[in-house]
């Protein structure tokens, strides 16, 4: 089956699932394709039904599942741009800024800049800086991360020592400087040298040196440079802490970087089990679609277990 025909067939399957309000099938279809291909499916959907999938989900209401599907079936660069505007409109949403700015590839950031300018008639970086003075280390991290200006430092041992000094002295500015200028390939080597010398993980050292929000921002940046899936796992774990959980964070990460973070279910093992944490934190109406999207567990087994418990 050629690519365009396949998109039409998938669009029909998605439409049938939406008409039947079959959340499991919708989630399975959504998670099967990368975001770029979902856009092709959405176009085929529009040609056949004269409406976009996201618009049909909007008619369902404003629940967690609907919100997640709306984001997943919207162009991810457009979605990121709109969420960034929400994050700086009114009270600053620092959690959203970490999710949206730190967990973003260079190519995705360039596309987001274009969409932001198109929708809001102002440059994204300028708008963020107007609304967020860099008066805290985590804000400076966001500010400088937006430049995506990295280079090879070519001195791993020296940089590992600088990192050690910055952490021992609680020097947030120095931590920011090395995080925002180092290429991912070299960051891994610097971290390995640091951890070999100190015999403790960098995350542990960051948590000891920075008890405030810098802890979250610095750890997210550190993990994104090492492996995007580790950053997703770290923040999803944070989102699953507490009684209610932070669905907005989980929704942002799932809809924007799922394709780039499919190792998340494996690296999450340092915190526990991804599927179990989703089910512990959210109702099954929300947790099961999330588990399906992240391919964290066999959905058929979950449904069978639920059926056995009922009977």
From Swiss-Prot:
GO CC, one annotated term: plasma membrane
Single annotated GO MF: calcium ion binding
Sorted UniProt keywords: Annexin, Cytoplasm, Cytoskeleton, Microtubule, Repeat
The organism's place on the tree of life at top rank: Eukaryota
Annexin repeat coordinates: 5-73, 75-146, 154-223, 227-295
Entry-linked SUPFAM superfamilies: Annexin (SSF47874)
Gene3D superfamilies linked to this entry: Annexin
Ranges annotated as spanning the membrane: none
GO biological process: cytoskeleton organization
Function as written in the Swiss-Prot or TrEMBL entry: Giardins are involved in parasite attachment to the intestinal mucosa and in the cytoskeletal disassembly and reassembly that marks the transition from infectious trophozoite to transmissible cyst. They may interact with other cytoskeletal proteins such as microtubules in the microribbons or crossbridges, to maintain the integrity of the ventral disk.
Pfam families to which the protein is assigned, alphabetical: Annexin, ANXE1_4th
Predominant localisation class: cytoplasm
UniProt protein name: Giardin subunit alpha-8
Protein family (similarity comment): Belongs to the annexin family. Giardin subunit alpha subfamily.
InterPro entries listed in its UniProt record: Alpha_giardin, Annexin_repeat, Annexin_sf
Species this chain originates from: Giardia intestinalis (Giardia lamblia)
Subcellular location, record wording: Cytoplasm, Cytoskeleton
């Amino acid at each position: 089956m050629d690519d365009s025909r396949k998109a039409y067939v998938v669009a029909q399957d998605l439409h049938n699932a939406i008409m039947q309000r079959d959340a499991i099938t919708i989630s399975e279809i959504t998670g099967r394709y990368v975001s770029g291909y979902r856009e092709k499916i959405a176009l085929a959907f529009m040609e056949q039904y004269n409406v976009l999938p996201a618009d049909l989900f909007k008619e369902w209401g404003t629940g967690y599942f609907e919100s997640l599907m709306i984001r997943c079936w919207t162009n991810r660069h457009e979605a990121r741009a709109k969420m960034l505007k929400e994050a700086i409109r009114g009270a600053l949403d620092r959690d959203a800024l970490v999710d949206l700015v730190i967990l973003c590839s260079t190519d995705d950031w360039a596309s987001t800049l274009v969409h932001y300018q198109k929708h809001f008639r102002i440059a994204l970086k300028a708008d963020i800086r107007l609304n967020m003075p860099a008066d805290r280390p985590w804000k400076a991290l966001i500010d400088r991360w937006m430049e995506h200006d990295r280079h090879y430092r070519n001195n791993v041992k020296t940089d590992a020592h600088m990192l050690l000094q910055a952490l021992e002295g609680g020097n947030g500015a120095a931590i920011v400087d090395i995080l925002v200028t180092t290429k991912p390939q070299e960051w891994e080597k610097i971290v390995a040298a640091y951890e070999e010398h100190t015999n403790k993980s960098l995350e542990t050292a960051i948590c000891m040196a920075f008890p405030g929000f810098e802890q979250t921002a610095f750890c997210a940046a550190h993990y994104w440079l090492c492996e995007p899936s580790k950053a997703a796992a770290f923040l999803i774990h944070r989102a699953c802490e507490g009684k209610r959980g932070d669905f907005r964070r989980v929704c942002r990460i799932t809809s924007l970087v799922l394709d780039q973070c499919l190792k998340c279910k494996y690296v999450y093992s340092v915190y526990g089990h991804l599927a179990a944490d989703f089910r512990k934190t959210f109702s099954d109406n929300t947790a099961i679609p999330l588990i399906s999207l992240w391919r964290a567990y066999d959905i058929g087994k979950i449904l069978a277990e639920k059926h056995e418990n009922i009977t």
